[in-house]
Amino acid sequence: MNLAWNKILEEVSKKISPQYYERFIDTLKLETLNSEKCTIIAPSATIKTHVERKYQSIIENAILEACGDKIPVEILIETKATSPLQSFLEKSFDQKDFQFNPDYTFETFIVGDCNRLAYTAAKECVRKPAEINPLYLFGSVGVGKTHLLHAIGSELIKKDPWKTVCYIDISSFMNEFRFALQSRELIESFKIKYQSYNCLLVDDIQLLSTNAEKTQDEFFALFNFLFERKRQIVIASDRPSSELTIHERLKSRFVTGVQADIQYPNKEIRKGIVTSHSKIMDLGLSEDVLEFLADQIEEDTRLLLGALNDIYLYKKSYSLLFLNLDKVKEIVKNRLYRKKNVEFSHDRIIESVAKEFNLDAAEIMGKSRKKELIIPRHICFYLLHNVFNVNKSQVGRLFQTQHTTVIHGLRKTEELLSDNKEIRFLVERISSKYKLQ
């Protein structure tokens, strides 16, 4: 039996690179080999799954070459006591445990100017994997980044069920890696798992920080491994890659593909989202209710979907067929952004800031990137959003700039307020002058 097995291994070695032969095939043990079946033992579920996906047909052909018979191959896992840590990792490596959200499809994604580039690029990742690589999606919470990641994963598997697709948020990746660092065997299993995927979908990459040195090194190595083999990589973040607090060498990898900014949806898109999901949920909402929801919830689309869930549960609880606008307002009142009855002029706020810095308001509102205009412009962002409750999208439209630029300006102003007493007093003066109590 050993002689036959050696011949089989010799045939397999001709078809697989030495690196992968040593990593996978060398770890297998022959249990039985007869005219009816060949039983092989793998040391772990990770190795078993990978060999079944990639090399089982090669082994079966090698048996035919060596023995002259077509014999089915069965791969079993070696029975041995495993630590809780090993069991955890083995379970986490099973792709069957993860299911893409069936509601997050390309068909249910409402397309508009705010997200058209991201949608088109995501579709292209399915049509021609690795043609756009990586695809980097960025935008604030609730604009549809996770929706597109799930849509890509679902479509790739639908197109080719043999594709191995991984969706993971970066926090989970970091936790798995920390566990795996406890032994050489586990870190090897970790590498095998992630290197085996045809597509990697990573959410919330902004949570990867410069403090996680080893995790960054591992992710960098994984990125290069998949990229060089033309495997699709899609990354989602709440900010442009230039604003990530990670090593420059990793940032440089993210800009090699397409960076797609997803803006907050306008009212037309929000109404499309509400209409589409209310039909799926069979809510039977009237036109005035749809208009109300689209008008009141302006930013995070998850709030829109949450409001629809509230309506659904209310209807189901009371066995109602129809809800009028007044009842809907009562049901979703805690989810709405409260619009303050404070009237003020945007121009007056901007003019006040300009006066403090001996500038013209038109300069602050303009496109110039002169250094002396940056801080006043950011202070305007801060006053309008944090003090007078103008949402970020409206601030962006007012200054004709991107949503991410507004977010960056708000962040910089908050840092400035904590360090600079003069700026803090300036903001307080303008706030007290215009804000009604």
Curated annotation (Swiss-Prot):
<keyword id="KW-0235">DNA replication</keyword>
<dbReference type="GO" id="GO:0003688">
    <property type="term" value="F:DNA replication origin binding"/>
</dbReference>
<dbReference type="InterPro" id="IPR038454">
    <property type="entry name" value="DnaA_N_sf"/>
</dbReference>
<dbReference type="InterPro" id="IPR020591">
    <property type="entry name" value="Chromosome_initiator_DnaA-like"/>
</dbReference>
<dbReference type="InterPro" id="IPR013159">
    <property type="entry name" value="DnaA_C"/>
</dbReference>
<dbReference type="Pfam" id="PF08299">
    <property type="entry name" value="Bac_DnaA_C"/>
</dbReference>
<dbReference type="GO" id="GO:0005886">
    <property type="term" value="C:plasma membrane"/>
</dbReference>
<dbReference type="Pfam" id="PF11638">
    <property type="entry name" value="DnaA_N"/>
</dbReference>
<keyword id="KW-0238">DNA-binding</keyword>
<dbReference type="InterPro" id="IPR010921">
    <property type="entry name" value="Trp_repressor/repl_initiator"/>
</dbReference>
<feature type="region of interest" description="Domain IV, binds dsDNA">
    <location>
        <begin position="316"/>
        <end position="437"/>
    </location>
</feature>
<dbReference type="InterPro" id="IPR001957">
    <property type="entry name" value="Chromosome_initiator_DnaA"/>
</dbReference>
<dbReference type="GO" id="GO:0008289">
    <property type="term" value="F:lipid binding"/>
</dbReference>
<dbReference type="InterPro" id="IPR024633">
    <property type="entry name" value="DnaA_N_dom"/>
</dbReference>
<dbReference type="Pfam" id="PF00308">
    <property type="entry name" value="Bac_DnaA"/>
</dbReference>
<dbReference type="GO" id="GO:0006275">
    <property type="term" value="P:regulation of DNA replication"/>
</dbReference>
<comment type="function">
    <text>Plays an essential role in the initiation and regulation of chromosomal replication. ATP-DnaA binds to the origin of replication (oriC) to initiate formation of the DNA replication initiation complex once per cell cycle. Binds the DnaA box (a 9 base pair repeat at the origin) and separates the double-stranded (ds)DNA. Forms a right-handed helical filament on oriC DNA; dsDNA binds to the exterior of the filament while single-stranded (ss)DNA is stabiized in the filament's interior.</text>
</comment>
<keyword id="KW-0067">ATP-binding</keyword>
<feature type="region of interest" description="Domain III, AAA+ region">
    <location>
        <begin position="99"/>
        <end position="315"/>
    </location>
</feature>
<dbReference type="GO" id="GO:0016887">
    <property type="term" value="F:ATP hydrolysis activity"/>
</dbReference>
<feature type="binding site">
    <location>
        <position position="144"/>
    </location>
    <ligand>
        <name>ATP</name>
    </ligand>
</feature>
<comment type="subunit">
    <text>Oligomerizes as a right-handed, spiral filament on DNA at oriC.</text>
</comment>
<keyword id="KW-0963">Cytoplasm</keyword>
<comment type="similarity">
    <text>Belongs to the DnaA family.</text>
</comment>
<feature type="binding site">
    <location>
        <position position="145"/>
    </location>
    <ligand>
        <name>ATP</name>
    </ligand>
</feature>
<dbReference type="InterPro" id="IPR013317">
    <property type="entry name" value="DnaA_dom"/>
</dbReference>
<dbReference type="GO" id="GO:0006270">
    <property type="term" value="P:DNA replication initiation"/>
</dbReference>
<dbReference type="GO" id="GO:0005737">
    <property type="term" value="C:cytoplasm"/>
</dbReference>
<feature type="region of interest" description="Domain I, interacts with DnaA modulators">
    <location>
        <begin position="1"/>
        <end position="74"/>
    </location>
</feature>
<dbReference type="GO" id="GO:0005524">
    <property type="term" value="F:ATP binding"/>
</dbReference>
<dbReference type="InterPro" id="IPR027417">
    <property type="entry name" value="P-loop_NTPase"/>
</dbReference>
<feature type="region of interest" description="Domain II">
    <location>
        <begin position="74"/>
        <end position="98"/>
    </location>
</feature>
<feature type="binding site">
    <location>
        <position position="142"/>
    </location>
    <ligand>
        <name>ATP</name>
    </ligand>
</feature>
<protein>
    <recommendedName>
        <fullName>Chromosomal replication initiator protein DnaA</fullName>
    </recommendedName>
</protein>
<keyword id="KW-0446">Lipid-binding</keyword>
<dbReference type="InterPro" id="IPR003593">
    <property type="entry name" value="AAA+_ATPase"/>
</dbReference>
<keyword id="KW-0547">Nucleotide-binding</keyword>
<feature type="binding site">
    <location>
        <position position="146"/>
    </location>
    <ligand>
        <name>ATP</name>
    </ligand>
</feature>
